[in-house]
Amino acid sequence: MATPREIKKRINSVKNTRKITRTMEMVSTAKSKKISDRVNASHPFSNKIKELVSSLASLGGVVHSPYLRRPEKIKTVALLIITANRGLCGGYNSNVNRMAKAKIQEWKKSGVNVRLFIVGKKGISFFKFAGEKAEKTYTHLDDKSGYREAEEFANLFLELFAKEEVDVVEIASTVYYSSASQKPEVTRVLPLEPAGEGSVSDMMVYEPSPEKVLESLLPLVVKTAFLKAILEANCSEQIARRIAMKSATDAASEMIKLLTRGYNRVRQAKITQEISEIVAGADSLN
């Protein structure tokens, strides 16, 4: 049985750990709130741009753009996987990695070549262990990442798609729906999905021509898609870390309660034993 001193030492150790997890929980809460505000602020603009570009794309034969190319057979896919550089965020990284791995296997079974681009140390190490070679890796993204990084990715994949080096561009990341709901999903970025029938009004007139309007807007809608993915992945990471740290803090508090009870029992037993020894000693003198 552990001595009171040993139990007390363990209680202090758990208390120190609880301080760390509680601090991390508070930091993640503040970061997730800040990033979620950025996500919500970007939605109206990105939705409007996507709506306008989809309407232009639905004009079909009127508009010609390399970014609207739809190959008869998909030969090569570019897949960008967004994970975190750090752990301590529950199943955030493992969920994205498993989903992306399943998607890669699905493409390969169909005879499609997959070009991997991985963001985050956790994704890089996972796919290195799985034997999947990444064409490019990135570890510079953090909770402050935004439009500059989105533009970097967009320019790369727009160029690959325009040169017909890839037929499809997809992003595997965690999509943010609300503070209570985030899901790992694969989102297709290119080619652009045109709007449905009747989405363009006959009364709509574009100045300058639809081709020039689309040419200027299409790179922008792709950049907003990457921006959305980056922001939502970062926000989801912070929410997952907040939940994980809260669970750790609660578990530490429960452990402290149990250890304190054990400490009191051992201490009480020791005191009782000492009293018994004193009484026994007194009796022997009599």
UniProtKB/Swiss-Prot annotation:
A Pfam short name: ATP-synt
Gene name, Swiss-Prot/TrEMBL: atpG
Record protein name field: ATP synthase gamma chain
Localization annotation: Cell inner membrane
Organism name: Leptospira interrogans serogroup Icterohaemorrhagiae serovar copenhageni (strain Fiocruz L1-130)
GO molecular function, one term: proton-transporting ATP synthase activity, rotational mechanism
Disulfide bonds: none
Keywords on record: ATP synthesis, Cell inner membrane, Cell membrane, CF(1), Hydrogen ion transport, Ion transport, Membrane, Transport
Main location: membrane
InterPro entries hit by this protein: ATP_synth_F1_ATPase_gsu, ATP_synth_F1_gsu, ATP_synth_F1_gsu_CS
PROSITE patterns to which the protein is assigned, alphabetical: ATPASE_GAMMA (PS00153)
An example Gene Ontology CC term for this record: plasma membrane
NCBIfam families reported for this sequence: ATPsyn_F1gamma (TIGR01146), PRK13427.1 (NF009960)
Gene3D superfamilies noted in UniProt: 3.40.1380.10, ATP synthase, gamma subunit, helix hairpin domain (1.10.287.80)
UniProt membrane topology term: Peripheral membrane protein
Function: Produces ATP from ADP in the presence of a proton gradient across the membrane. The gamma chain is believed to be important in regulating ATPase activity and the flow of protons through the CF(0) complex.
GO biological process: proton motive force-driven plasma membrane ATP synthesis
Family statement drawn from the similarity comment of this UniProt entry: Belongs to the ATPase gamma chain family.
SUBUNIT field: F-type ATPases have 2 components, CF(1) - the catalytic core - and CF(0) - the membrane proton channel. CF(1) has five subunits: alpha(3), beta(3), gamma(1), delta(1), epsilon(1). CF(0) has three main subunits: a, b and c.
SUPFAM superfamilies cross-referenced by the UniProt entry: ATP synthase (F1-ATPase), gamma subunit
Keyword Protease: no
Domain of life: Bacteria
